[in-house]
């Protein structure tokens, strides 16, 4: 008779998509609004303080939201919220893939460049360590704050897959 290992019949918990907008909820991109409207597995995290964002407050709100969710989390962020995720990873140093199992980061702003609005520049110098989960970074060539080459460098540093919907390689 062979030894058998009991198999759990417990169904793994479905992940929650935590949408972390980088600006006022009223100004959310259409894709975010559509996801929130059509998907039952999405929840929006309002970081607040839009007129004067505060990095550590945003990181704390993000961490508290992740801690209260009792299932795997996929973070979806755009703009300045992408940097809040990078700072969360830097400060909290979570174990790889737990509880955040993935991230989609869209149009991270280049906050390390000189002459930037001081409210946004407070999120620099951007952490450059690999993120604690698989991630995708999508630049926005139409966003004046998202420098394409900087976004490519962040993807490399964060160990995120760089996905440009318009090209397969970054511009020279």
Task: Set out the residue ranges of the language-model regions.
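The conserved beta1-alpha1 loop
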Residues: 18-22, 78, 139
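Conserved hydrolase catalytic core segment
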Residues: 87-102, 111
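Short beta-strand/loop motif that positions the catalytic acidic residue
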Residues: 130-132, 136-139
